[in-house]
């Protein structure tokens, strides 16, 4: 198994640098037939989604579709596929950022009763408590 860094995954997905994209494809080619041979860890997923949204201006629906494609590709493995899949489902059905969905899902999986936040979109997620600051 090998791990992909964010910039390698971005090159693979966007092909905005043909030489780098080709280099990534060449490195991954021997692993195409090997199930779960390329790790996409949670940090890489979050950084990738942030970059695609902010820098490349991907729409939310395109990001959701991309996450679903990554999950269905047999070559890729994840820190916890079930947690990532649940986070993708939350992302698809809410206004929260993927990172917030992943935080909430992972915290619940790790036994947290709830996750507290000041983020309104995240606060609407299951097992998330929206805090309100009281004025002095």
PLM region spans:
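Active-site neighborhoods of divalent-metal-dependent phosphate/nucleic-acid chemistry enzymes
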Residues: 75-115
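Active-site-proximal, substrate-binding regions of enzyme catalytic domains
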Residues: 53-56, 60-71
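Short, conserved alpha-helical segments within structured domains
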Residues: 41-44, 83
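Acidic, PIN/NYN-like endoribonuclease modules and their adjacent C-terminal/linker elements
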Residues: 104-136
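Amphipathic alpha-helical segments within well-ordered protein domains
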Residues: 10, 49-53, 88
